[in-house]
Amino acid sequence: ERWAAKSWNIRSALSTRRFWLLFGGYMCGTLSHQSVMVHQVAYLTDRQFDPMLGATVVGLVGIFGSVGKIFWGWLSDRIGREGAYALGMGSLVLGIFVLSTVADSSQLWAVYLYAVVFGIGYGVFAPLTSSIAADVFQGRRFGSIYGVLYVGNGAGSAIGPWVSGALFDATHSYVVALAMATGAAVVSALAVWLAAPRKVRQVPGVVARAHG
């Protein structure tokens, strides 16, 4: 209650462990999904798929990402932010695993399964990063605080695809890059869980069950 009642500004937010857990969690989450998003077409063409299929997959990931945005936002209002975020990251990891099993163009079904599962997982990021931050640092200066938090997102977007490309150039394989993306997603979910927005503000669904 004391945390929730505090009037936060950038300086006071920067001095907290929760801020840096969210900063690191958001950076790792973005690093994970952008590493895959940027290289997915190259990955598929490297396995002899037509570039047009790669473009189709990009579109499907976007479509199912939109579905995921609605679903994860809805779910987080009922079970809690970090639980929904962890499930979303789990979907992302499952999608990466499915993609990693695609060895050649005979596995078209796996490519479409990847697009659905990864896309839905990818959709967790937009609604949950903002709502988690708002739960933790709600107040008159929230926009400024969230802007600084979002630097982590930008860093992940810049680092992930570049490192993935460098790893491919060094190993002539995406195995290590996909492992990195998987690990980053797990770290992201863990960091958000440790930031524990549930201990600052309970979501409506949890409050309703507690009083039901």
Positions of the model-derived regions?
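Extracytoplasmic gate region of multi-pass secondary transporters
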Residues: R11-W72, G160
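Interfacial helix-cap and linker-helix signal at transmembrane-aqueous boundaries
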Residues: L44-T45, L75-S76, V163-H172
